[in-house]
Amino acid sequence: MAPPKALETIGKTLHSQYERWQPKARYKLQLDPTLEEVKKLCNTCRKFARTERVLFHYNGHGVPKPTANGEIWVFNKSYTQYIPLPITDLDSWLKTPSIYVFDCSAAGMIVKAFLERLDWSSSSSASSSKDCILLAACEAHQTLPQSAEFPADVFTACLTTPIKMALHWFCNRSLLRDSMEHNLIDQIPGRQNDRKTLLGELNWIFTAITDTIAWNVLPHDLFQRLFRQDLLVASLFRNFLLAERIMRSANCSPISYPLLPPTHQHHMWDAWDMAAEICLSKLPQLIADPNAEFQPSPFFTEQLTAFEVWLDHGSEDKKPPEQLPIVLQVLLSQSHRFRALVLLGRFLDMGPWAVDLALSVGIFPYVLKLLQTSAMELRQILVFIWTKILSLDKSCQVDLVKDGGHAYFIRFLDSLDAYPEQRAMAAFVLAVIVDGHRVGQEACANAGLIYVCLRHLQPENPNDAQTEPLLLQWLCLCLGKLWEDFPEAQLLGLQSNAPEIVICLLSEPQPEVRASAVFALGNLVDIGSPSLNGADDDSDDDEKVRAEINVVRSLLQISSDGSPLVRSEVAVALTRFAMGHNKHIKSVAAEYWKPQTNSLLKSLPSLANINSSNVYSPSSLIQGSSGLASHIGPVLRVGSDNSATARDGRISTSSPIATNSIMHGSPQSDDSSQHSDSGILLRENASNGGLNYSRSRPIDNGIYSQFIATMCNVAKDPYPRIASIGKRALSLIGVEQVSMRNSRLSNGGAHPGETSVPPSSNFGMARSSSWFDMNSGNFSMAFRTPPVSPPQHDYLTGLRRVCSMEFRPHVLNSPDGLADPLLSSSAAPSNMGLDILPQSLIYRWSCGHFSRPLLTGSDDNEEANARREERERIAMDCIAKCQRSSCKMTSQIASWDTRFELGTKASLLLPFSPIVVAADENEQIRVWNYDDALPVNTFENHKLSDRGLSKLLLINELDDSLLLVGSSDGNVRIWRNYTQKGGQKLVTAFSSVQGYRSAGRSIVFDWQQQSGYLYASGDMSSILVWDLDKEQLVNTIQSTADSGISALSASQVRCGQFAAGFLDASVRIFDVRTPDRLVYTARPHAPRSEKVVGIGFQPGFDPYKIVSASQAGDIQFLDVRRASEPYLTIEAHRGSLMALAVHRHAPVIASGSAKQMIKVFSLEGEQLTIIRYQPSFMGQRIGSVNCLSFHRYKSLLAAGAGDNALVSIYAEDNYQVQ
């Protein structure tokens, strides 16, 4: 072939080869160019490319090598001599982004010169160097191979025709080299882009292997840049890996910028060689018979199997699965797609680290495109995969909406043939799509998402089984996010009867569902957008305001919910209401707390005797509660109250809000009973600042009065964060709480008051074993998250979870964080606006569920089960021993000076460690190891000034036990990690007698592990039954007595049964399972006797016998199957009996008196032991006995003294330190 013809052929071949890789690009050839032609070509290409990448391919065969300065050679105008072209000039013409290919000997000289230029360049030029890529055929000192085995332009051949080049090179080195004609390689049938042909499958395998090599050896950011952002760049670098492998066999080392690590010996090349050998072995037959059926290579099947093996044994701590890029390629094949998606789903379920790896390999565009398929079998697994992706990377929402992916999930959510757990995942995906993304909100609203969610929130048949709680939760969260700061969607929701539908969920047993419903309702409340307040839309605005007020009425009724998560969402929602209705609430507040009305406030009608069931039903929630305004309206002197309440109806006297709003929030609450002022300051000159979007006119002043009273209640919530939100809401309306009982002095200084908040803004719930934490280990469940399981009431099992307000912010990778900023009760600044709203946390916290493994059980559960089984064995052994023991308690094995200022009020022996917990009236809690005589931990139950302790109780004793601290004002706080020095965490807190102010400060408690019930009562006519599993008040039992309750004891045998001792010395037994509740009444103590100070069911498993002790000193033994008269009486003390303890299993009881004496009795009335003196040389008397408690499984007795603050522990003579 003549030289000019050869030159033209080379150029056309190179053009066609590049065009195969990027057919849409424009290519321009310059054969033997001059300097001016190169410059013009570069400038023209950059002009047309604009900001796109320009490829510059230099074939330097037949011209001198590059100079030491990195100059390449071109011709002058007359083609009489070579002229050097510096790389700096080339770079200045092409600019960036660009990619250079230099196929010539000593090509490394050019790369070296380019790198030196980068070092000399300014920082701005260096910053654009990432957009410049160089591929060079060899290093600076190397010459290209001239062997007949390789073509002259072997580097270019590898970059542009990799399959044929790889097969030729492999054939010369395989066992096929003698039996196969090499020219057949050029006749491989098929098309490169058709995976069902031999050439297409080989190209597919080659792509998968080179991607796998690159992903496993390159940093992930470099892999993304080179292999996932530009199709041509990705193809060139895949082929560059082949060039390195082939040319290194000829002692040439291709180099690149950015520099890649060596890959020519990677073991995945062996997989390529095997695939190539299988192909070449079939090639003669396929060429001889073009109609022969094509048999796919087993490569992808084998790689998927290898990936599956890794899934069975791999973990985050092990090396990542190298097959991940291959799995991605397999998604392109319909025959392997389902299996690949299933395996990919299993991998993503391993945790956020797995999702991050999958995203780094480039999964996103593949699974995005799959949303366009209509294959029914892929729906469940695609929803699962997208759930896992979005649980880590919210930014994917933009591309999902852009490609219409939201419609796919709306259709899935609306399909009844999918499992509820899977539809919950679809709701989660949609919630992420609309989260803070107005385009997503508009798209989903226009697609009817509001109507779909509302339709599935309400069962078609009221008798249908309860919807999966996880689905209810995420339907509410999805609606809330759709309505958030989107007035048009809010209006659609109000017009679609959304409040009435969502309000029905406020009585659901799951706190997560209730909190999510509150979140949705709260986002229906407009925080003050003026868009709907125009003069032409007054009637529409009135309707909107009425709807908002109905929403707020329902929220006010659950402001005393047992779950801090729910109460926190209520507080956030009510703060939104305070902003949107700021003007009118402030005017009502000003009227409420005018100084001249103080005398009237003292005459507020007492609501203390109004009974509160506090068990919310959907109907009562929907009815509203504006009737409360009729109780306080005349006193508040708000003119429209009466008409408003007459129009909207009155609540029943059993409504929980009727007894808690005013009595808790008014100046006559317990905190101000000793003071003439209200403890509330009205900031007359408080500026609205950014709160000028208030409504143009009031609709119902009664609701504003009720709102203020409730927020005063919220501002005293036992959970610090909720209290701080309440104070912030009060400050928004110009009201500030001040300490009504001056902070008590502690250590010479003022003790922090209620305004304090935790040092951490962490918040949320962490279930120890909740309905959404139970994981299914059966993969055949088709990516279902497990459904709710009803409580398994089993002895020694009991409560499975208690809500935790501890929040883990690493759940989502979000730049703005997950936790809400700390709040204080300081006055709001004059420029306050939307940024002062406390953040809702239920959504971000709920997202954490999907970032955890859903398909497999966790090792933590296995460890917990093993620990529980071991503790059950220990407990049974100890029970058997103590039942056979003498129980004489004659040996004092430990004595601990707690240094409590007011003496020891309560003590508790832990069942599986030598630990005793003690507390005083100031609610200081101290933990001590009595075997080692060492302190373990000390902390305060709270930092409020009002103090008083009632009881210490242990929850989940066979698991990671929780410490319940009951305060005498009815507040309950539950702690975990209380035996770790400084590691205690507040799990939950709530008021157990919310609204019963007449109960005073004498609330008594007891806990029933089997049922998960906490019983609370006091100087009141009702006994409140709280389900701590549901975090909900489930029953209010009327005591039918004329006096209050002084002692409570729950049966450890019969769920729902408990005994109560009264101030009038009577005894009653109740059972929540019976219609009448009351099952036994007796007056075993003498007439006009003092109150019952202790009561308990007798040891063992007999549910019919109880023991009651009165302050007069007598102990009565009762059998409920007989008459109400006692069958045994012990005159234990002559008055001043202060404490009674009944062992759970051993046949022994103990009593203690203020006269420094402890007596131990058998169940037959025999006095086993009397303790008067300390076992010391001086023989001092023991202190006045404030509390007694037995070890649950051993013959150990702890006694706390009231005067000398000692806690003494007594045992049998043969006690041995464990």
From Swiss-Prot:
GO cellular component, one term: TORC1 complex
One Pfam family per UniProt: WD40
Top-level taxon of origin: Eukaryota
Record-level GO BP terms: cellular response to amino acid stimulus; cellular response to starvation; positive regulation of cell growth; regulation of autophagy; TOR signaling
Biased composition (Low complexity): 664-677
UniProt xrefs under InterPro entries: ARM-like, ARM-type_fold, Raptor, Raptor_N, WD40/YVTN_repeat-like_dom_sf, WD40_repeat_dom_sf, WD40_rpt
Bias (Polar residues): 640-663
SUPFAM superfamilies: ARM repeat (SSF48371), WD40 repeat-like (SSF50978)
WD repeats: 899-938, 945-985, 997-1036, 1040-1080, 1087-1128, 1132-1171, 1180-1218
Keywords: Developmental protein, Growth regulation, Repeat, WD repeat
Residue numbers spanned by region Disordered: 640-677
An example molecular function term from Gene Ontology annotations: protein-macromolecule adaptor activity
Similarity comment: family membership: Belongs to the WD repeat RAPTOR family.
Oligomeric form and interacting partners: The target of rapamycin complex 1 (TORC1) is composed of at least RAPTOR, LST8 and TOR.
Function: Component of TORC1 complex, which is an essential cell growth regulator that controls plant development. Acts by recruiting substrates for TOR. Acts by activating transcription, protein synthesis and ribosome biogenesis, and inhibiting mRNA degradation and autophagy.
Identification of the protein by name: Regulatory-associated protein of TOR 1
Annotated organism of origin: Oryza sativa subsp. japonica (Rice)
